Amino acid sequence: MARRFDGKNVIVTGAGRGIGRAIAQRFASEGADVMCVGRTLEPLEKTVALCGSGFAHSADVSVSADAGGMVDAALDRWERIDVLVNNAGIDDETPFLDMDEGNWDAVIATNLRGPFVVSQRVGRVMAEQGGGVILHNASIDASGGDGPFASYNASKAGILGLNRTMAVELAPHGIRVNAVSPGFTHTDMTERAVGPKLMEYLLHDFDRVPMRRLVKPEEIAAAFVFLASDDASGITGINLTVDCGLTANWYILETLPTE
């Protein structure tokens, strides 16, 4: 039986770990040939091995020359680019009053400038070939005040604005553009950040979240694959939240004194 992405070519940035790796694996399992992009080749090559196909390419998405080289490498292998997933991202925990411009610029360069640069180059290819799909990894932090992540939150809010504008401008070219906003997700970065005791709580009794657990990377990947598929052919310009219900819960009564 044919798979949804048989014969399709997909670029995933930030594919060396976590959500990006899960996205690459899911597309590969659905038949796609996946270009795994990131700054360091070793983890990308591990992702390719887990996918069982595809190839790795080292690039810094915030650097225009690297973005151009990435597109050139893709077109050396493929005749067309069907899907781009802008997943690469970094954060910075410097408190707002202590943050310098270097902290700010580094996060904005990767998280917002990078998707603009890469999307523009890939978008031109897609417009010429008659269509395609561009997807952005945003965050629930785009709509909240999670701290101390001022630069990260601002970059993800910018992604949602870029997402809507791209959807409107690129629709006449047959290009759909959507975003996915993950909630707290179980990745190796999360485990390192919180430690084993807190991780056990987050995985099984996270009472701030209605489903009482973290999101799985595979659940995020499923959202990306759906939005890239023909099953979502009428969907563009949306932001799909995958957070186990976190942003639906105002959590007001639970914080009040019991007496």
Write out the residue ranges for each language-model feature.
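C-terminal substrate-recognition "lid" of short-chain dehydrogenase/reductases
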Residues: W78, F116, R176, R213-V242, ...
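Substrate-binding pocket helix/loop in short-chain dehydrogenase/reductase
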Residues: P95-F96, N103-I108, D205
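Active-site helix of classical SDR
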Residues: S119, S155, N163
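Alpha-helical segment proximal to the catalytic Tyr-Lys
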Residues: R124, V168-P172, S233
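Conserved glycine-rich cofactor-binding loop
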Residues: G14-G18
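Residue(s) in the substrate-gating loop at a strand-loop-helix junction
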Residues: S139
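Conserved glycine-rich Rossmann-like NAD(P)H-binding loop of the short-chain dehydrogenase/reductase
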Residues: E30-E45
